[in-house]
Amino acid sequence: GEGRNGVWLARQGHAVLSVDSSAVGLRKASELAAAQGVQLRTLEADLATWTPAPASFDAVVLIYVHLPAALRSAVHRTLARALRPGGWLLLEAFHPQQLQYQSGGPKDAAMLYTLEQLRADLGGVLDEVLAQECTVPLDEGPGHHGPGHVVRWLGQAPAQAAAHPHLLQ
C-alpha cells in the first residue's frame, strides 16, 4: 500500500515496519510519514519468501493483503509465528461478496477471503478474539469509495508459546 495504516499506527505511538513488494509504495509511505511528522521503517520484500524471525513482533496488521489461495495459508502461518507471546494479528480483507460492489478489491473470487478460510489458516495457531463479516462504507480514495463487503479477524498468540506447539514449528 501507500502507508496510510502504517502512518496512522505510528501516529498512535507504535514502532512500525511497513513491508511491501513495491519500492514505489514504500517511498510513498515514507513521504506520508515525513509529512505527518512520524517515523516508520520500511522493508521491500515479497511475502511469499520473507520469513521474519519467530516471536519478533507485538502485532501484525494485514489490511487488504490479498494473496492467492496457494500462498495465503503459508503466509498467514509465517506471520503468526512472528508474533511474540500475547501478540496480535489483525486482518481486514474483502469477502467474495465484494464482487457485487464497485469499490475495489480483486476481481478473482479465489483472492477474496472468508472467515472459514481464515480460521483454517490460523486456527490452532492463534486464539480467535474477533471474527466479523460485514458491509462497511469505504472512502480510501479513487476506486475505493462506496460500500464494501469485508471480513475482519483478530487473533492473539497464546501468552505461552508452548500452549500452541504450531507456533514453534
Describe the residue ranges of each PLM region.
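A short acidic, Gly/Pro-enriched loop at the edge of an enzyme's catalytic core
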Residues: A48-A59
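Short alpha-helix
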Residues: A109-Q132, V151-R152
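A short glycine-rich, Lys/Arg-flanked "PGG" loop and its adjoining helix->strand segment in the class I
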Residues: S73-P85
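Conserved SAM-binding strand-loop segment of SAM-dependent methyltransferases
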Residues: A35-A48
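Conserved beta-strand signature within the Rossmann-like core of class I S-adenosyl-L-methionine
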Residues: G86-F94
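Conserved SAM-binding motif I beta-strand of class I
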Residues: A15-D20
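A short SAM/SAH-binding and catalytic strip from SAM-dependent methyltransferases
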Residues: D58-S73
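Conserved SAM/SAH-binding beta-strand->alpha-helix loop
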Residues: S22-V24
